[in-house]
């Protein structure tokens, strides 16, 4: 009954590990989407799209949205984070692929070893049964020989008794 619980728990733990391995990608994706939306707002400020009555701010005043260098720096930071996460995931993939290959080889070796052990066990059992059969046949032949000897001695004794009775009946 506890077997299925163990399998279920193991499956949940494996799922959690997979999801936690991709947290960096999820965070990078969220940041990229935020930057993209911020970049679109910044582009509206720079191009002057929007309401015609909105005045373009003077050169001394800062824009309400982030500046282009800030957006560019944030995008570069996110790109480097995404590349770092990608390289980590690639390294993890390589590591897991290597481990998978090792496990496959080990599984193949274990299967062969199990087959060899089963064959040896079968041969041992066969040898044991043959030995028991030989011992039973020897016992049977010994008992038959003893039985024949007993019958021969009994027949000889009965024959002597019959002759003795015959000899005794001649004089009566």
Curated annotation (Swiss-Prot):
<dbReference type="InterPro" id="IPR013923">
    <property type="entry name" value="Autophagy-rel_prot_16_dom"/>
</dbReference>
<keyword id="KW-0472">Membrane</keyword>
<keyword id="KW-0653">Protein transport</keyword>
<dbReference type="GO" id="GO:0006914">
    <property type="term" value="P:autophagy"/>
</dbReference>
<keyword id="KW-0813">Transport</keyword>
<dbReference type="Pfam" id="PF08614">
    <property type="entry name" value="ATG16"/>
</dbReference>
<dbReference type="GO" id="GO:0015031">
    <property type="term" value="P:protein transport"/>
</dbReference>
<comment type="similarity">
    <text>Belongs to the ATG16 family.</text>
</comment>
<protein>
    <recommendedName>
        <fullName>Autophagy protein 16</fullName>
    </recommendedName>
</protein>
<comment type="function">
    <text>Stabilizes the atg5-atg12 conjugate which is necessary for autophagy. The atg5-atg12/atg16 complex is required for efficient promotion of ATG8-conjugation to phosphatidylethanolamine and ATG8 localization to the pre-autophagosomal structure (PAS). Also recruits atg3 to the PAS. Involved in endoplasmic reticulum-specific autophagic process and is essential for the survival of cells subjected to severe ER stress.</text>
</comment>
<keyword id="KW-0072">Autophagy</keyword>
<comment type="subunit">
    <text>Homodimer. Part of the atg5-atg12/atg16 complex. Several units of each may be present in this complex.</text>
</comment>
<feature type="coiled-coil region">
    <location>
        <begin position="70"/>
        <end position="153"/>
    </location>
</feature>
<dbReference type="GO" id="GO:0034045">
    <property type="term" value="C:phagophore assembly site membrane"/>
</dbReference>
<keyword id="KW-0175">Coiled coil</keyword>
């Amino acid at each position: 009954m506890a077997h299925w619980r163990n399998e279920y728990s193991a499956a949940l733990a494996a799922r959690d590990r997979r999801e936690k391995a991709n947290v960096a990608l999820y965070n990078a994706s969220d940041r990229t989407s935020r930057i993209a939306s911020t970049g679109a707002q910044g582009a509206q400020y720079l191009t002057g799209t929007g309401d015609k009555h909105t005045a373009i701010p003077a050169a001394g005043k800062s824009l309400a949205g982030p500046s282009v260098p800030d957006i560019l720096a944030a995008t570069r930071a996110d790109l480097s984070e995404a590349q770092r996460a990608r390289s980590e995931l690639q390294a993890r993939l390589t590591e897991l692929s290597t481990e998978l290959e090792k496990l496959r080889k080990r599984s193949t070796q274990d299967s062969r070893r199990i087959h060899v052990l089963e064959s040896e066990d079968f041969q041992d059992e066969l040898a044991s049964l043959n030995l028991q059969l030989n011992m039973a046949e020897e016992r049977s032949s010994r008992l038959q020989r003893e039985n024949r000897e007993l019958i021969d001695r009994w027949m000889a004794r009965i024959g002597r008794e019959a002759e003795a009775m015959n000899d005794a009946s001649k004089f009566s």
